[in-house]
Amino acid sequence: MSEISRVALFGKLNSLAYKAIEAATVFCKLRGNPYVELVHWFHQILQLPDSDLHQIVRQSGIDPARLAKDLTEALDRLPRGSTSITDLSSHVEEAVERGWVYGSLMFGESQVRTGYLVIGILKTPSLRHALTGLSAEFAKLKVEALTERFDEYVGASPENGLSASDGFNAGAAPGEASGALAPSAMGKQEALKRFTVDLTEQARSGKLDPIVGRDEEIRQLVDILMRRRQNNPILTGEAGVGKTAVVEGFALRIVAGDVPPALKDVELRALDVGLLQAGASMKGEFEQRLRQVIEDVQSSEKPIILFIDEAHTLVGAGGAAGTGDAANLLKPALARGTLRTVAATTWAEYKKHIEKDPALTRRFQVVQVDEPSEHKAILMMRGVASTMEKHHQVQILDEALEAAVRLSHRYIPARQLPDKSVSLLDTACARTAISLHAVPAEVDDSRRRIEALETELAIIRRESAIGVATAERQRNAETLLAEERERLAALEQRWAEEKRLVDELLETRARLRAAAEAVDAGGVPLGEGEVRLDEEQRQALHARLAELQAQLSALQGEEPLILPTVDYQAVASVVADWTGIPVGRMARNEIETVLNLDRHLKKRIIGQDHALEMIAKRIQTSRAGLDNPSKPIGVFMLAGTSGVGKTETALALAEAMYGGEQNVITINMSEFQEAHTVSTLKGAPPGYIGYGEGGVLTEAVRRKPYSVVLLDEVEKAHPDVHEIFFQVFDKGVMEDGEGRVIDFKNTLILLTTNAGTEMIASLCADPELMPEPEAIAKSLREPLLKIFPPALLGRLVTIPYYPLSDDMLKAISRLQLGRIKKRVEATHKVPFEFDEGVVDLIVSRCTETESGGRMIDAILTNTLLPDMSREFLTRMLEGKPLAGVRISSRDNQFHYDFAEAE
């Protein structure tokens, strides 16, 4: 034994046996025994929940109680009183050696299981004698039966999936542990079992979700797989569109027998590329594993189709170091048709790694998996709804499925359908399930705020006790604490009321469901003894259900504390948390918003009613589905002098239509005055610097397909830049530098220009003789044609913006002063008032007509706000609180009255 390293020998024990010998060593020391004996080890193994030894004891008819008693007595017979362990006994070391010999040579394993230890001990006379000396029960073990039917004996032992503790897969050949030799060939079909997963078996056992809406792609797969040669489809598409789902759908069809006869007995196995690469430490080992997988597939009695997900990892630079030759191993088998493969990768990785190898490209037939339409995605969601209901124990309404698709498509543009809609619905289900039992987030947040305020007050009182001036801080903190406690009381009262209504609502639904002999929210069929309801009782329950839903809806408003079912509101609240867009704005009736759009816009844009009505009409036509669906929602050129509300129109539209001003894509066209800057907008072509990074415009629209595109000062751009928009205005699409088609169909495009402003100013010089917008637009055509090509003007609607009159300036002044009022009241908690004289004074100072409404902002920013700010800061420094602010006009100047708090 001295020639064999003990570390190497004991390293062959699997993790369970190794931990047991470690525990035996500790146990031996605690008992004061000098040597670690077999009895220590077997005692510790039998203390575990399960192992090979447990299974063998059960199968051999050994009495566990008698065995435990015998082992305890054997332990008591050992000498005691030692302060330290001298060594492992020779029996333990010899048992491991014999276990390794029989495990590696008889069973071809690279680990020592506790079952192999038992066989090694029973096959060695001296060890067998020592074992039966521990307990006569061990004499019942039959070594011949154990070796012949070892798999039957160990059954579902937890040691089945373990490996040697030293991390090496095999140790049969000298020098292999050091990596000096290539790994030996695996047994028949061993590579398949080790490196692949049987998808058809998973489909047969119900582990795969039903796949809906990918019939066309599955049919293409079948067409290609039925070829005699080059029968290898490769699925390409963006991450999350469902490439793997197509293959799972194919596996489900094979199991259902819904495939041609030639494919009915086929096994579909997924190759685990990560497992194939893991531990392939030396050159050639990865290729050897792949070759053995290919050989197993080709030699299998049952035809096998191999599914390779993330196929680019097998090709050249796409894989790990040393995997460059992997694709060359596949090529001959793929070309001859002896290895049928379904591959999947993203389009970008396909172009980067596979397309560059023509020999590999011709062996694969591309099947494009596009993002599904909203309609198809809803069908897919209906397919997974029942699975989610069973998992989360909640009820999902059909409106939630539609909301998950539509809201995710609109507000989560960075991901693809159906992946993002499934994630959204899953989160909404989890939130609904939690809300039925947990404390609502609003209540929990309120409690945390109260704790924080109480801590702050305790600190203030401690400071006050040592003479620090804290009266103002204490007053503010006590006010906030009282408000928060009042808010918490209201929340808890509403929570209790909602809980009562939800419990009754769920109980009523359960009764109706039971009466209909349906399946409850958990997916479990109800018993036979359920009470039947007559028609009158059923109608009464339906009426009560409608009444409860109405009460709950009225109580909850747009901020529910408990979600009884997964509905539109539940899904919208998740989107609100993910995107920051208020849930109420999305849940509000979109059609109502569109119908009243001009009224909403007129509150913010002053004096341009004709323009807002024209834009609103176009949006209403598009929303009704009567416009050309392949064009953008609308394309308008807003012409007028500076400061009349052109840019503000874009911001107001984004706020009303798309949920916030963050959905305005602003491109300053004055930056594109040279012809070569076209590539900045749509992305550099191949071979140019910046290729692959996307264009300023195309990337922004790809990320935010529902947005307002504002092309500011478009007259300053180079004529070549104007021409790239022809296709966008006509067909609603633009190709970027990489050839991807960017969809503009859900955008509203506004171009602003100062061209023709002199003509507009002269036509509108007399307010009494103000021409109609159509007349101004007709007059504007001539100056616009000097800058823009007729083809561009013909593709858009020109809307002139009137110069601002005194009445318009007064309305804008009131709007701006109203915003200041809100800021003062929110920041300083004091009232803010102003009289009409202030408005007249502001308008009288607007002498620069070419600046429009911007002059009002300049007057307020440079005059009124600095004076107010100085007074606020001075009073904060002196500790004099304010009770209110009033601004008036006196001697052609702003006059400020600051009321002091008592």
UniProtKB/Swiss-Prot annotation:
Q: Which Pfam families match?
A: AAA, AAA_2, AAA_lid_9, ClpB_D2-small
SUPFAM superfamilies documented for this protein: Double Clp-N motif (SSF81923), P-loop containing nucleoside triphosphate hydrolases (SSF52540)
Domain of life, per the record? Bacteria
- Please list the residues that bind ATP 2: 640-647
Can you say where in the cell this protein is located? Answer: Cytoplasm
Family designation = Belongs to the ClpA/ClpB family.
Q: Which Gene3D superfamilies match?
A: 1.10.8.60, Clp, N-terminal domain, P-loop containing nucleotide triphosphate hydrolases
Q: Which residues form a coiled coil?
A: 441-559
Q: Does the keyword ATP-binding apply?
A: yes
Record carries keyword Chaperone: yes
Positions bound to ATP 1: 237-244
Q: What are the residue boundaries of the Clp R domain, all occurrences included?
A: 10-151
Q: Which PROSITE patterns match?
A: CLP_R, CLPAB_1
Q: How does it assemble?
A: Interacts with TagJ.
The outcome of changing residue 310 to A is: Loss of ATP hydrolytic activity and hcp1 secretion
This chain belongs to the protein called AAA+ ATPase ClpV1
Q: Which UniProt keywords apply?
A: ATP-binding, Chaperone, Coiled coil, Cytoplasm, Nucleotide-binding, Repeat
Show the segment(s) annotated as Repeat 1: 13-78
Per the record, GO CC terms? Answer: cytoplasm
What the protein does?
A: Component of the H1 type VI (H1-T6SS) secretion system that plays a role in the release of toxins targeting both eukaryotic and prokaryotic species. Acts as an AAA(+) ATPase that disassembles the contracted sheath, which resets the systems for reassembly of an extended sheath that is ready to fire again.
